[in-house]
């Protein structure tokens, strides 16, 4: 599959929309994750209420795939708890590795199915989810 098939219009639209881009005033959890192989960097911040995401912001320095994945998170993560985000993260890996269709109620994840077979790009999509999980762990009470 060519780069033009991976970076299709839906990916470009999600990356451009940048849903959730910004910073929170007083986040409960924050994580910064880098991919040294490609230079992508994601900073994710969360606020929680009763164990569920009540606020979320991200800053991404990365490729279209990384920015699009962060935008999907910005669009869908509100109201989710850590276990739900973990399931979505596993689903993302299955979409990339096994070309399984999205089933979590996050239909936008299907836009990443053309990335299947391009292993060097998997982490670009997964990085925002890793950052969100790390931010949720940082927000969890000790």
Model regions and ranges:
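C-terminal binding/interaction regions
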Residues: 1-20, 80-142
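Structured beta-strand/loop patches that form or line metal/cofactor-binding pockets in enzymes
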Residues: 14-60
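Functionally engaged cysteine thiol sites
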Residues: 38, 63, 124
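Short, thiol/selenol-centered motifs that function as redox-active sites or metal-ligating centers
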Residues: 60-69
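Alpha-helical support elements that line or immediately flank enzyme active sites
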Residues: 69-81
């Amino acid at each position: 599959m060519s780069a033009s098939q991976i970076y299709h219009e839906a990916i470009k639209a999600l990356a451009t929309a940048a849903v959730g881009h910004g910073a929170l005033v007083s986040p409960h959890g924050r994580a910064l994750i880098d991919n040294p192989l490609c230079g992508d960097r994601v900073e994710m911040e969360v606020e929680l209420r009763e164990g569920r995401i009540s606020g979320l912001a991200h800053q991404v320095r990365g490729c279209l795939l990384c920015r699009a994945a962060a935008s999907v998170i910005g669009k869908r993560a509100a109201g989710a708890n850590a276990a739900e985000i973990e399931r979505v993260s596993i689903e993302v890996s299955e979409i990339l590795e096994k070309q399984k269709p999205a089933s979590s109620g996050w239909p936008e994840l299907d836009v990443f199915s053309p990335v299947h077979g391009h292993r060097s790009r998997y982490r670009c999509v997964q990085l925002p989810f890793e950052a969100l999980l790390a931010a949720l762990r940082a927000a969890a009470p000790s």
